[in-house]
Each structure stands twice: as C-alpha cells, then as structure tokens.
C-alpha cells in the first residue's frame, strides 16, 4: 500500500512541476505567410497517443479556443483543436490573415488532459 501512495504522490508532484510553453512564436509576433510553432515542455515527457507511459503525454494546440470545460473527456479534433499524437514537437500553420489566440494543452495516451492539467499561457499572434 505504501508503494502505491508513493507512486501517486510522485505523479502528482511531477505534473504540478511540469510546464508546457511556446519556444516560438512569442506573444505579439506578426507573420506574413506560414507560422512555425515550436512546443516546449519541462518536467514531463512526450509519447505518442496510444502509448501508455508514466509521466508522458502529447501536445494539442488550441487555436482561438478555450480550454475544454470538461477536462475528463478527450480533447476535440478539429481546426481549433490540433492533435500531435505522433509525439511531434513543432508544426507549421497556414492561417488566413487575422489575429489568433494560441494555447498548448497536454493530453494523455487517450487524448484526455491529465488529472492535474498541463497547459501553457495564451499567446496572441497576427497573420498579415
């Protein structure tokens, strides 16, 4: 029983200390054309969807979308909720001119946010 409690306690401490963030772009950046997005992660690992490993997950990029209201459900997959289930850590977005709000959210092997959700600050970019 003690081992189980220690394992749960360690997992909780790891997700609490974990951070997902944007390496690029920076908040307020302006672009002409495609936007390269590079994901950063500390205190946690990246693993493809479908692979259940402790202290890992994969990236989801929210575009002009709020965090899910129910974090116990899988993250939607659509234009505003991009899945990187192969374990990718960067992408290139082709966006129409406009202002975009971007946020990263980690999901587990089933695309469900972790019990202690790991998400980035929101950044805003403009495509001209």
PLM segments and residue spans:
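Sec-dependent N-terminal signal peptides
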Residues: 3-13
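Short, compositionally biased P/S/T/A/G/V-rich stretches that sit at domain boundaries
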Residues: 17-32
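Short, well-structured beta-strand segments within conserved domains
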Residues: 35-39, 89, 98-106
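Short amphipathic, basic-aromatic surface patches that mediate peripheral association
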Residues: 40-50
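Beta-sandwich strand segments
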Residues: 48-53, 110-119
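Beta-strand signatures of extracellular beta-sandwich domains
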Residues: 58-62
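A beta-strand/beta-hairpin structural motif
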Residues: 72-91
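Internal, hydrophobic beta-strand segments that form the core of beta-sheet-rich folds
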Residues: 96-111, 119-123
């Amino acid at each position: 029983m003690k081992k189980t409690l220690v394992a749960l306690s360690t997992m909780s401490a790891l997700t609490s200390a974990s951070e997902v963030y944007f390496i690029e772009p920076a908040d307020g950046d302006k672009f002409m054309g495609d936007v390269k997005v590079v994901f950063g992660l500390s205190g946690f690992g990246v693993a493809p969807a479908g692979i259940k490993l402790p202290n890992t997950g994969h990236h989801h990029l929210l575009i002009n979308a709020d965090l899910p209201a129910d974090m116990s459900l899988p993250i939607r997959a659509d234009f505003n909720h991009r899945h990187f289930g192969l374990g990718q850590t960067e992408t290139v977005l082709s966006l129409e001119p406009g202002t975009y709000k971007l946020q990263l959210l980690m999901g587990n092997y089933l695309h469900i946010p972790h019990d202690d959700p790991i998400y980035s600050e929101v950044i805003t970019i403009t495509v001209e």
